[in-house]
Curated annotation (Swiss-Prot):
The protein's name in its UniProt record: Large ribosomal subunit protein bL27
Keywords: Ribonucleoprotein, Ribosomal protein
Species per Swiss-Prot/TrEMBL record: Cutibacterium acnes (strain DSM 16379 / KPA171202) (Propionibacterium acnes)
Ranges of compositional bias, category Polar residues: 7-19
Annotated region described as Disordered, given as residue ranges: 1-22
Family per record: Belongs to the bacterial ribosomal protein bL27 family.
Protein encoded by which gene: rpmA
Amino acid sequence: MAHKKGASSSRNGRDSNAQRLGVKRFGGQLVNAGEIIVRQRGTHFHPGDGVGRGGDDTLFALRDGNVEFGTRRGRRVVNVTPVEAPVEA
């Protein structure tokens, strides 16, 4: 079994694809139910009110509303607060 491959061969040339992680909807933005808010590995952000967590720790909106980032018990949380409908006079 040769371990030297020859003159025009290389052991390099492999790389993995980017995972495209990060915050997808920022604080104050409107979201619809089901929209992804944060893609993450582990729980860097925790789900708050109106936010669900997928099997790969992705946070998504459970209802329509505004995205809010905050803290609860020393943890960074993401909430979705419902938008108040304008009142007709």
